[in-house]
Amino acid sequence: MHKFWPRHSPNFMACRVAVRTVQPRDITVGLSGGADSLALVAALCAEDYNVHALCVDHGLQPGSHEVAQQAAHHARTFGAHAEIISVTVAPGNLEANARTARYQALHSRNLPVVVGHTADDQAETLLLGALRGKATGMQIHTDNLWRPLLGVRRATTLAACTELGIEPWHDPHNANTDFLRVALRTQVVPLLSDIIGGDAVPALSQAATLIAEDTHALHVDTPDDRIAQLAGMPPALRRRHLVALLQAYGARVSAAHLRAVDALITNWHGQKAVPVGNGLEVTRKDGRLSVS
């Protein structure tokens, strides 16, 4: 390992301390070229991880391949192995489909995956989920995915890049308020900070972390489809079973779907089957919920 960082680099040191939570030493790291992922790759290299930096080119913007090449160059100067992979994003929901394609590429190398989500991303995730009727949060480690920077601010990763003497890529999509996450980041979070007279991100991020921990504790591996058992559960636990049941069949899970399916259990009056997307529907039959 060669030392590529200056002696005085407190922001970069904060990133280095954060990544020490990552347990596997051979890892794939998602690298967009932005400040978060550059600081992440650099910190992992400084901590002597065997880093395979994967630059996913979605091909959605002019010059995207050049951005990926520059990101890969930075990663190699840190001592990482770097690779560029091009993906095709399915039409429809651009954000969601790009994310799906990106994670498929990252997991294709059969190594634990590390990504650069920060505390700011955690706060935005909470608000996004709340607006969709289901507040959510991210965990530092789930299955084969690590997010070690969840306790680090976006401003810290940007400052770390400055300390390292590198200029991160600034994604034009991050200025497009047509994307809900961007609108929350640039309009709602600053407004909340003004209202409380301070930075709203730490409290939002902490709330999201607590929700993520609760979600993990209540995770259901094998959902129960028996009406009597479901009816006797506390509502929060019953919802977990319904979510797991719908996901097991590839149905869409929304607040409206959950309410309608829950009514088959708690407010049964002979209602018809509940459509749950992807051509599937849920019916109540012989004391069980059936998805077909």
UniProtKB/Swiss-Prot annotation:
Pfam families, per database record: ATP_bind_3 (PF01171), TilS (PF09179)
Compartments (UniProt record): Cytoplasm
Gene Ontology cellular component terms for the protein in this record: cytoplasm
Coiled coil: none
Catalytic activity: cytidine(34) in tRNA(Ile2) + L-lysine + ATP = lysidine(34) in tRNA(Ile2) + AMP + diphosphate + H(+)
Biological process terms in GO annotation: tRNA modification
Keyword Nucleotide-binding: yes
Family in the record: Belongs to the tRNA(Ile)-lysidine synthase family.
Role, per record: Ligates lysine onto the cytidine present at position 34 of the AUA codon-specific tRNA(Ile) that contains the anticodon CAU, in an ATP-dependent manner. Cytidine is converted to lysidine, thus changing the amino acid specificity of the tRNA from methionine to isoleucine.
NCBIfam families on file: lysidine_TilS_N
Name this polypeptide is given: tRNA(Ile)-lysidine synthase
Originating species: Corynebacterium diphtheriae (strain ATCC 700971 / NCTC 13129 / Biotype gravis)
Chain's gene name: tilS
